[in-house]
């Protein structure tokens, strides 16, 4: 009987290991294999070399059907690359000179010459794999709770078994009870689900850095979006130029504004410079250039002291600005201490933004808020278009942090969605920080708890659905796979209905249930529409 019992218990352990190995194999296979060799362009020739011999700046040839060996920029040729392994997008992306490509992705058609920018462990592919594998070892709060329960449950079990033995003197019953009172399943119920959920998300171009973030997103009550570059495409265009100084022409106003903005990396500044160049304006080099965070830029252009920025920048300098709020973004331009004109810009809503907001509401998020440095009129127009519940406008970066802290102080569980770079402080103070468009941007991947490799807003609904499904699966594992089966087993043992061998056979039940329930996460289809309330995930 003892030998049979040992065999049955080993079978149970094998089932548990099988599930874990399957999930981890899914993680290792989610991105595909990076080739070990590359075709190096060497003058007019090409030769096959090991990846380890490549250096940054080398040009490699990639042909149709090849896996791209390095991160780099296309310098010749054209083609279409399947980047699903990195971004989760199934439609191949056209590639031509100037386009970025990633190691581990597949060139479906054409041929490319790629200038190497990152090799081996420095590639986006390698960093994604490292992050996902590190996430396997992180523990969610519910798992920590299960571990604590198992710790204090053991002495209670020992006392219980001693009492039963004193009363019954039945060794067979004690062995049977030992099988059913083992807390081993408590340690299996959570990690299997966490690994499976992380693997499933990574297949869709969503990187979750650990179980703690999976659980916090599942329980989030409020989702906060940064506006620019998240809900909007982040590529504003000049819509109007207004001159208020009769001594200046429109071209001269643009010359002053673009002269300063050419040194700025802000999207609004880049839009002004692009528009000025399109109008044929000769853009001068500024001197004494300075960035005023959350306000704009200052400096000297053509010997004149120039300020380019929002109303607060000019007001702080003692320059009067009209107080009427516009439903577009307005950049004011001042020269030599007085307002000389303004430039209006508009941004476009990101495709799918409205559907994503509706999907989050349907997925149990009670409140959705938007943070922006734009004025109240612009912010409220965008919020009305998208169905956003709460708006916070005219914010500096530190103000965004304060708003999120205030929400958390009120007891809200806050997830913040931003670009992962400019919003890093706000992402850090949120319970869950989500960076969009992190593909190829290591800073964005590192800044957030969850990184979306593309700018597809539907992925936010998808990762919320995965998180909720995983959290529910853990609860099911603990309740059905552990609680119900063990309670029934202990009852049957105390009544003398079963012995050790039957108990060991029944003991396989929780392991099999946990195995089947957890692996469902590896084979589900993510639904991202507003009908996700009833069934966030469904089988293919």
How would you label these PLM feature ranges?
Residues 1-37, 41, 55, 59-60, ...:
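Actuator/coupling domain of P-type ATPases
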Residues 7-10, 152, 173-191, 504-515:
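Small-residue-enriched core segments of transmembrane alpha-helices in multipass membrane transport
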Residues 18-33, 192-211, 519-534:
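Juxtamembrane helix-loop transition segments at the membrane interface in multi-pass membrane proteins
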Residues 43, 212-422, 426-432, 465-468, ...:
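Cytosolic catalytic headpiece
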Residues 29-122, 212-257, 300, 389:
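Conserved cytosolic catalytic loops of P-type ATPases
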Residues 19, 38, 57, 72, ...:
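Residue-level signature of catalytic and energy-coupling elements of molecular machines
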Residues 1, 149-181, 205, 479-506:
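Helix-interface capping motifs at the ends of transmembrane segments in multi-pass membrane proteins
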Residues 177, 200, 364-365, 386, ...:
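Membrane-embedded alpha-helical bundles of multi-pass transporters
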């Amino acid at each position: 009987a003892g030998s049979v019992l040992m065999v049955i218990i080993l079978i149970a352990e094998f089932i548990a290991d099988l599930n874990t190995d399957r999930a981890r194999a899914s993680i290792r296979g989610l991105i595909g294999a990076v080739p070990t060799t590359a075709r190096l362009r060497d003058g007019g020739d090409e030769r096959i070399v090991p990846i380890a011999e490549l250096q940054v700046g080398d040009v490699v040839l990639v042909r149709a059907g090849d896996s791209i060996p390095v991160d780099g920029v296309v310098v010749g040729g054209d083609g279409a690359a399947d980047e699903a392994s990195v971004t989760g997008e199934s439609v191949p992306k056209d590639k031509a000179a100037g386009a970025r490509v990633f190691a581990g992705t597949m060139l479906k058609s054409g041929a490319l010459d790629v200038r190497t920018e990152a090799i081996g462990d420095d590639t986006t592919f390698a960093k994604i794999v490292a992050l996902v594998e590190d996430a396997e070892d992180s523990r969610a709060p519910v798992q920590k709770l299960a571990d604590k329960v198992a710790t204090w449950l053991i002495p209670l079990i020992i006392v219980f078994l001693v009492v039963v033995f004193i009363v019954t003197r039945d060794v067979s019953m004690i062995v049977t009870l030992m099988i059913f009172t083992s807390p081993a399943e408590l340690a299996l119920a959570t990690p299997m689900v966490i690994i499976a959920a992380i693997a499933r998300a990574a297949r869709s171009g969503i990187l979750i850095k650990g179980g703690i973030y999976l659980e916090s997103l599942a329980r989030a009550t409020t989702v906060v979006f940064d506006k620019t570059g998240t809900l909007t495409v982040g590529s504003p265009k000049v819509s109007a130029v207004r001159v208020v100084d009769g001594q200046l022409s429109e071209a001269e106003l643009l010359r002053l504004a673009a002269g300063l903005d050419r040194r700025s990396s802000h999207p609004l500044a880049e839009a002004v410079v692009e528009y000025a160049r399109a109008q044929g304006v000769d853009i001068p080099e500024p001197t004494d250039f300075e960035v005023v965070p959350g306000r704009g830029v200052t400096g000297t252009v053509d010997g004149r002291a120039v300020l380019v920025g929002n109303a607060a920048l000019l007001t702080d300098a003692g320059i009067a600005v009209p107080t009427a709020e516009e439903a577009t973004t307005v950049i004011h331009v001042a020269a030599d201490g007085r307002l000389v004109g303004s430039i209006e810009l508009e941004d476009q809503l990101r495709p799918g933004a409205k559907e994503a907001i509706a999907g989050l509401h349907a997925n149990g998020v009670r409140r959705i808020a938007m943070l922006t440095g734009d004025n109240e009129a612009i912010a409220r127009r965008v919020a009305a278009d998208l169905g956003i519940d709460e708006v916070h406008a005219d914010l500096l970066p530190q103000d965004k942090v304060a708003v999120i802290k205030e929400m958390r102080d009120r007891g809200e569980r806050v997830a913040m969605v931003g670009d992962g770079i400019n919003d890093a402080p706000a992402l850090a103070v949120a319970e869950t920080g989500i960076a969009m468009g992190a593909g190829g941007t290591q800073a964005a991947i590192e800044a957030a708890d969850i990184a979306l490799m593309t700018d597809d807003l539907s992925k936010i609904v998808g990762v919320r659905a995965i998180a909720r499904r995983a959290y529910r699966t853990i609860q099911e594992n603990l309740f059905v796979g552990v609680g119900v089966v063990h309670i029934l087993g202990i009852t049957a043992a105390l009544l003398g209905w079963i012995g050790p061998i039957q108990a060991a056979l029944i003991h396989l039940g929780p392991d099999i249930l946990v195995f089947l329930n957890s692996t469902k996460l590896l084979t589900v289809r993510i639904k991202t529409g507003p009908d996700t309330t009833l069934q966030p995930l469904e089988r293919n």
